[in-house]
Amino acid sequence: MNLLIFMLNMLLKNTILLNMNNSKRKYLKTFINSYPSRNYIITHQAKEFTSICPKTGQPDFGIITISYIAEKKCIELKSLKHYLQSFRNEGIFYENIINRILDDLVKVLKPKWLEVKGEFSTRGGINSIVVAEYGKKNK
């Protein structure tokens, strides 16, 4: 019975959170890139990323590294922190986390190049690294 209640709660929580996915982008704020003609790489690293395993309901921990070459906009760090924290209570697979972050940042920044890398803590003796990329690095 407890397992059934847990699964129903996870299903309801995931349904609510899936409906909120588009609103996560609201956290992301930008500022003007003062050097748009220069191809310099900006890298941000969140060493305390957390989400929830959608299968077990247990917390997942990882390091998210975001690197990009800005076009007209750069990401504001406080907003990035709040955006990444919004995954804290969401049941989501590693692959989906990285691709959603990539899609959201590309939509907001419209960068020349962007890479999102997730290095997730060992679970069941296996650690996972997921990398997704947009654009050309040497544009």
Predicted regions and their residues:
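N-terminal intrinsically disordered, cationic/polar leader segments
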Residues: 8-139
